[in-house]
UniProtKB/Swiss-Prot annotation:
GO terms for molecular function: structural constituent of ribosome. Belongs to the eukaryotic ribosomal protein eS1 family. Pfam families: Ribosomal_S3Ae. GO terms for biological process: translation. This is Small ribosomal subunit protein eS1. Signal peptide: none annotated. GO terms for cellular component: ribonucleoprotein complex; ribosome. Keywords: Ribonucleoprotein, Ribosomal protein. It comes from the Archaea.
Length: 225
């Protein structure tokens, strides 16, 4: 029994010493997101940091409470000293928030589009349109086609950093809302998920935040349930 306890104690000491040997690294966002620290992570070897994913809410990054439902993901792509750089690899929106936006007597129209930006990044974009009243099938088809065309065109005409800002901060959603509401009454537009499929040129430049909000709302009051 004494031997077993001694072995157990020795194992605990080894585990404790291993943890103490780890070094903490600060994870920074790309310069297009401010180059801010979004978290810390420990590692024995800095090489093991490459590829790690760090998550942060858009609210925490921008200090805008209305962005609480959006989560952003950054992958570590380099280490210098105790600092780790990262690249944006996608975002999503909480299920609870999306469910709360769906109402009866409205139609939900989804679009999933793989696009390539001006600087060669391939991105999968998932967008959602909610109509103000129930739409017929031909209206849904027309809106979906128009959504896909707008997303493809904006990606083709902009660099990756600018396109990401348009997705997250409202430029892309506002463009879809403005064009598609001419076809049918709309209530809401969400760019609810994205995923970077291929990386292009490593171009980083500060991007001005669009004035429009991420969520485009119709000026009229909601349809009574």
């Amino acid at each position: 029994m004494a031997r077993m306890k001694a072995r157990s104690a020795k194992g605990k000491r080894v585990a404790k010493d291993t943890w103490k040997s780890k070094v903490w690294y600060d994870i920074y966002t790309p310069q297009s997101f401010g180059g801010d620290v979004i978290g810390q992570t420990p590692a024995n070897d800095p090489a093991t940091l490459i590829g790690r994913i760090s998550e942060i809410s858009l609210r925490d990054l921008t200090n805008e409470h209305s962005k609480h439902m959006t989560r952003m993901y950054f992958k570590v792509d380099g280490v210098s000293g105790n600092n780790a750089t990262s690249q944006f690899v996608g975002h999503d929106t909480t299920r609870e928030y999306l469910k709360s936006q769906v109402r009866r007597r409205r139609s939900k129209i989804n679009a999933i589009v793989d696009v390539r930006t001006k600087d060669g990044f391939k991105v999968r974009v998932k967008a959602l349109v909610l109509t103000a009243v129930r739409a017929r099938d031909h209206h849904k088809t027309e809106i979906r086609i128009n959504m896909e065309q707008i997303i493809r065109h904006m990606a083709k005409e902009t660099a990756f950093a600018e396109f990401v800002h348009a997705m997250l901060m409202g430029g892309l959603g506002s463009k879809i809302y403005g064009d598609c509401k001419k076809m049918f009454p709309l209530k809401r537009v969400e760019i609810f998920k994205s995923e970077v499929l291929e990386f292009g040129k490593a171009v980083e430049a500060p991007v001005e935040e669009p004035a429009a909000e991420e969520v485009a709302e119709a000026p009229a009051a909601e349809t009574q349930e």
